[in-house]
């Protein structure tokens, strides 16, 4: 098609021929293109018009006007047919048979085929139809298929889309609600942590105040004593060089009294006892605290800042020894009410009888049920007796403690 278009193109305007005219030299040009050349030739020749020369071969032509030139009807018809072919859609070709147009419709396989496919290919003995009939039939089928597809799209896809969007919206709402709960939880947790931190720091401030109240009076006493010592030293410095006996004796008496008062004033202890809380406090013991128990964080309990408690009181140790002695004393008397040997003998007889029945296969099932019930009843009685013995022993111990006021 491209080569044909080159032959149908005017050399002057480089477009398809429009009303082509042929020169005596057999070259073709558009009518409008030749008119333009003739007008230019007339303007350039003022006195006498020069002969017209062919733009292609430069051969002179004695034509006086374009209308006198012959119309090339054959070329004009070819150009018109070419324009129609160029405007019409391009026919597809067969992929199996190169260059063969798909101009037949196979009704059996519902597809376009070429002539080779219909006669010698895989579509032999199939039902065929013309392109026009197939177009009409497939057009009706398209309308039905399109309507059913539209119904399916609206009935299934759109409904699922609505469902997905609804579920998405609900899921986002739930996530937002849960995130708000998480935010509220951590805000409460942070509030609890801040509150607990302030409580513990407040306890430290209270202990600091107690330490100041304990140490400040002793420090003030020592400062007063040091002040008295400085005054005594100043008195000694003032009269050590006095040579008058009366004045020296007076100053000596005052110095001796000052020294006596200083020596009689007791000095406060320098190693005041420290609270166990202040010695043993360590935040590493809080590392095992869980978040749910964060409200239970507290400082170790201490009755006073400057008092310490021994881990074992002598009275508690004595009480433990007494309770152990009571158990040793009252235990045998309690167990006299119940004989374990008799109970074991009864169990031995039951097991011996049960063993004798093991050799009798016929009675084994029936007797095993009976002895199993006997065993469970015996265990229940045994547990009840142990419980009663324990209660009696504890009751005797409690009466002894209350009687002698050990607690």
From Swiss-Prot:
Zn(2+) binds at residues 94, 97, 117, 123. Gene3D superfamilies: Classic Zinc Finger, Zinc/RING finger domain, C3HC4 (zinc finger). A zinc finger (B box-type) spans 89-131. Residues 172-200 form a coiled coil. GO terms for molecular function: transcription coactivator activity; ubiquitin protein ligase activity; ubiquitin-like protein ligase activity; ubiquitin-protein transferase activity; zinc ion binding. Keywords: Coiled coil, Endoplasmic reticulum, Immunity, Innate immunity, Membrane, Metal-binding, Transferase, Transmembrane, Transmembrane helix, Ubl conjugation, Ubl conjugation pathway, Zinc, Zinc-finger. The chain crosses the membrane at residues 316-336. It comes from the Eukaryota. It is an enzyme of class 2 (transferase). Pfam families: zf-B_box, zf-RING_UBOX. It is a single-pass membrane protein. PANTHER family: E3 UBIQUITIN-PROTEIN LIGASE TRIM (PTHR24103). Interacts (via C-terminal domain) with VCP. Interacts with AKT1; the interaction ubiquitinates AKT1 and leads to its proteasomal degradation. Interacts with MDM2; the interaction ubiquitinates AKT1 and leads to its proteasomal degradation. Interacts with p62/SQSTM1. Interacts with TRAF6. Interacts with IKBKG/NEMO. The coiled-coil domain is required for the induction of autophagy during endoplasmic reticulum (ER) stress. Endoplasmic reticulum (ER) membrane anchored E3 ligase involved in the retrotranslocation and turnover of membrane and secretory proteins from the ER through a set of processes named ER-associated degradation (ERAD). This process acts on misfolded proteins as well as in the regulated degradation of correctly folded proteins. Enhances ionizing radiation-induced p53/TP53 stability and apoptosis via ubiquitinating MDM2 and AKT1 and decreasing AKT1 kinase activity through MDM2 and AKT1 proteasomal degradation. Regulates ER stress-induced autophagy, and may act as a tumor suppressor. This is E3 ubiquitin-protein ligase TRIM13. It comes from Rattus norvegicus (Rat).
């Amino acid at each position: 098609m491209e080569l044909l278009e080159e032959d149908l193109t005017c050399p002057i305007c480089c477009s398809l021929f429009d009303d082509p005219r042929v020169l005596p030299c057999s070259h073709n040009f558009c009518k409008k293109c030749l008119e333009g050349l003739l007008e230019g030739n007339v303007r350039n020749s003022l006195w006498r018009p020069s002969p017209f020369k062919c733009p292609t071969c430069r051969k002179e032509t004695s034509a006086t006007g374009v209308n006198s030139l012959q119309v090339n009807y054959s070329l004009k018809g070819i150009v018109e047919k070419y324009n129609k072919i160029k405007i019409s859609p391009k026919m597809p070709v067969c992929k199996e048979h190169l260059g063969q147009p798909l101009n037949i419709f196979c009704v059996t396989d519902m597809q376009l085929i070429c002539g080779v496919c219909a006669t010698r290919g895989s579509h032999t003995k199939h039902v065929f139809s013309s392109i026009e009939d197939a177009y009409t039939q497939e057009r009706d089928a398209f309308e039905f298929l399109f309507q059913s597809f539209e119904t399916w799209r609206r009935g299934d896809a759109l409904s699922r889309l609505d469902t997905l969007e609804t579920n998405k919206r609900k899921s986002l709402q739930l996530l937002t609600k849960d995130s708000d709960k998480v935010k509220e939880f951590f805000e409460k947790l942070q509030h609890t942590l801040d509150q607990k931190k302030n409580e513990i720091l407040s306890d430290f401030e209270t202990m600091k105040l107690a330490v100041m109240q304990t140490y400040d009076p002793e420090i003030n006493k020592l400062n007063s004593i040091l002040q008295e010592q400085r005054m005594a030293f100043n008195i000694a410095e003032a009269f050590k060089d006095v040579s008058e006996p009366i004045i020296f004796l007076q100053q000596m008496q005052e110095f001796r009294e000052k020294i006596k008062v200083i020596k009689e004033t007791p000095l406060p202890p320098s190693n005041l006892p420290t609270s166990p809380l202040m010695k043993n406090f360590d935040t590493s013991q809080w590392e095992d605290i869980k978040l749910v128990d964060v409200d239970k964080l507290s400082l170790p309990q201490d009755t006073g800042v400057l008092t310490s408690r021994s881990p074992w009181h002598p009275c508690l140790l004595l009480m433990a020894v007494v309770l152990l002695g009571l158990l040793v004393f009252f235990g045998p008397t309690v167990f006299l009410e119940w004989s374990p040997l008799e109970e074991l003998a009864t169990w031995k007889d039951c097991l011996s009888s049960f063993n004798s029945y093991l050799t009798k296969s016929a009675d084994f099932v029936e007797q095993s049920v009976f002895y199993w019930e006997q065993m469970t009843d015996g265990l229940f009685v045994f547990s009840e007796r142990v419980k009663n013995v324990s209660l009696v022993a504890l009751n005797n111990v409690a009466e002894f403690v209350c009687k002698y006021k050990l607690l």
